[in-house]
Every structure is written in structure tokens, then in C-alpha cells.
Amino acid sequence: MAKKYSSVLTIFLCAIFLTCVFGHRGISMASQNTEQKNNWFFRKEKKFLHNIDTFYYSVSFCNDFLKDTEDENVKTFRKDFDKLAATESIDINLDWSLPGLEDMQLIYSNRSFAGYYNNCISCPERFDIFIATRTPTDITSEILVQLRSKPLWLQGVVSTFEYSMRVINAISKYYHLQIHEVKENRIDYCWHTNYLQSPEKYLRIDNFVQMQVSRFKRINYQYQFKPNNEYENDYISLGRRSDKCFVRMYLKTKEVIEQGYKPWFINEWFYNQMISRFDYYVLSNLYELRNWKYLDIIRLQFYSEYGSDEFYRTKCNDYMHELATKGVVNFDSVNKLADKLVPRLTVIMNIEFRTTRKGTKSYCLIEYERNKKYGVTKRIYDYLDNRRMISDYLTHDTLRLVDINSDSNKSRCDYTNFWKSLRRTKQIDVAKCVPEKLHRDYSRKLDYNLMKRRYIHSAISLSLYGKGINNDEVEQDLIDNLAMLNDNDIHAAMNYKYKRSHQLNSEDFENKLED
């Protein structure tokens, strides 16, 4: 018995000795105190965020917009927009306004949509109004409006719709056109969630086919290979885009990074505690690189800045230096080290139901007496007031995921816990409590850093193409680049600056960016 306790004591003392000797090479992020852990890694589990992400609506007039119309008001309207189209052909967007719209930033361009919508009135990052001055049939809508994602998420759907309708009403009043009907054209219902942190397992085809109850006959999966023989299921779709309803499930975090737009989503997820401060750091830095494959490198960058173990910080810096100088690195080794030192990035999935007019026109909506005061736009208000009922229909009759163990008849099975949480998500159409300026400043700073990186790379490339391979200082390269420009280049630059400045929202860029 004494020998037994002696052996245990020996093992215990050896463990203490090894901890003292090698403990400094442990995962030091894991050894931080609870307060530090909460600061960097706290997030709410299994959280959902719902909103209408895309909203198209169409407007038709009582007036005759056919090619051989005799309506004088339509002829005046057509003449004015034909003049704008001829002027805009020099590739410079034009300021545009009508009485009552002086407080709105509006620009005209002759962008084409669907063949015959050849005029576009835009409010940067808010909406685009596509106008057909000639329609092929008398049942074709003369105007199609696209409401952008940013105001829909940050200001609310009704507020964004009413803001765009100010322009429609101003056009109607100024040109004496009578609005006949305003109706929905396409609406996307989206659920952002951090519920699934291993979507490639949960949504694996053999699991999905057992869980799904739907009218879809086909499904499309897209995978991407990852380091260390792992793979990533980043896109699933059911149906076709031209169908009444098209369903997508994909990695929203990856889309934001690779597409290089909508960086304000990162802020939105952070303020709703769907991602941690660590995730916020990684996504913000990764956005500037616009390359998803550098995810593990940014995780190492985080540790090199905030980790406490000098041995591992040096290893992190070595990998980053190797990538910066050689352009290549062993991503398998990088991935293993990142997994050892820091948590994996929180994945945000987007579950999206894209509905089109061919399906929504048959919906039996509850008509609200209070919406009669809105006149020709009553259909839109009724549709938005039926939002909960429509989303319940989409997430049950169009597609639902069920627990096959809950009933012998699959059609009677209860929802999976994941699907229950999705259907319980709150649907509140109000402006967000987080000041919009925070989102604007955050997005602008990320885009500024992205543009600066591109500018530096382009400036060096221009110098090498112009002067050949040289050892000049970078400052000299920049000076020489300016000397290469002629009058035509300066004129083209001024035209582009004018055009680009009109494409940006003036509220987002009214002041100099603060460092």
C-alpha cells in the first residue's frame, strides 16, 4: 500500500516539475483569467438575426407608355429622360432632382435593366429606380425599384420604402402622371445565425435528405478544400433562381470577405453579440485582404499581438514574415498552430428564402383597414404587415427541417431544434439602436484600408512597368508616377473623381477620415 502511494506521489511531483518547466509553452490564451477571456471570446450561442435583405417593387401608371403613345405628359417625360441619356453618355453621372427632393442626394445614369429599363435614378447605397420610357405591352410596369440591403437592415423596411416613394410621387406630380398600382416584385427573407458552427456536418447530404420536407426535387452543394484534409461546405441551394421561391444556405462571413462589400454586417453581428471581439478582430483584418484563405494567418496575427508566450509569438511572426516575403507558406502548418493557440472563427450562416412575384401574387394576405389610407401603396403595407405569416409559410410549407425520430410519419414530424429557433426569431421593423454613424465610420475605415493597399500595389506596379526594374526609393517612384501623367490622364482622372464622388453617399463621406 505504501508503495502504491509512493508511486502516485512520484507521478504527481513529476507532473508539477513538467508544468513548471514547459508550462510557458502551453496555450497561453487559455490560461488567461476569466475577465480577459470574456473580453475577447464571449458571444451568445445559437443566436438568430432576421430581416428582409432585398426588396424590389414595381410601379405602373394609368398613362399610355407604349411606343406610339399620344399622351402629351408621357411625351414630355420621355423627352426629358432622352436628353439626360444623351448627356450621360460621356460617362459622367448627373445630379438629378425635382421639386420637393432637394434634401435627397440623387444621380442619373443610363444603366440598363431587363432590356427596356434604360434610365436609372439612384440614391447611393439606398435605392435604385429603373425607369422605362417605352414599354413593350400595356401591362408592363414603367418603374422598378430596388431597395438596398444597408437601409433595410439599419433603418427598417417601411422607412426605406417610404423614402424611395418620395421620388416616385415627385415624378408623378411633376409630369402629371397617375399611379395605377404599386406591388412587390421580389423579397428576400434572411436569417443570419451562429447556431451551426459545423454546417458541413449538420447539413451533410445524407443528414439533410432525412431532415428536409419540401417541394424541391434537386439540391446543389458547393464545397471548398481546406488545410489538413478538411473541407468547407460554403453554399447550398434548392430550386432555381427563376422559381417562385429559391432557397440558399451559405457562409455569410465568407461572402462579406470575398466579395469585399457590406462590411457593416461585421459591426451588426458584433453589436448583437453573434461574434466575439476576437472574431471582430479577425474579420476586420481579413476584410482588408479580401481573401478567405488567409483566415489562419490573421488568427496567428492576433496571437502575435495579444498572446503572452514569446515562443509561439515568434513562430507566428515567422509564418507571417514568410508569407509576406516569399508569397507562399505551409497552410497546413499554419492551420495546426492557429488551432493550438486560438479558437476557430465563429461562422455566420445565412438562411435565405428568395420570393418572386409569380409566387407572392397568389398569397392570401390579411387586409388591414388601417392601410387603406395609403391608397395605391396599400398592397405593400399589407404585405409587410403579413411578414410573420409569410415567413411561417415559407419555413413550413416551402422548406422545413424535421426530427425524423419524433413521428413515424415524416410529414407529421416536429421541427429540429435548429429550425424551431429559426422560426422563433423576432421580427421587428425598426431602426437599429446602434447609431448608424458607427456603421458608416467602421465601413469607411475598412474600405479606406482596402483602397490604400490596392493603391500601394498599383503604384509600385506602374513604376516597374514605366521605368523597368529599379532600386529607387518608394517616394521617388510615386513622384515619377505623377510625372508620367499627361493632360488627357488628368482630365480622365477628374471625370472619374466627379463620377465616383456622385456614386458615394454624401452622408458617409462628408468629413475627412479620422485616424
What are these regions (language model features)?
Residues Y5, L9-D441, L450-D515:
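Structured, helix-rich domain cores that form ligand/interaction pockets
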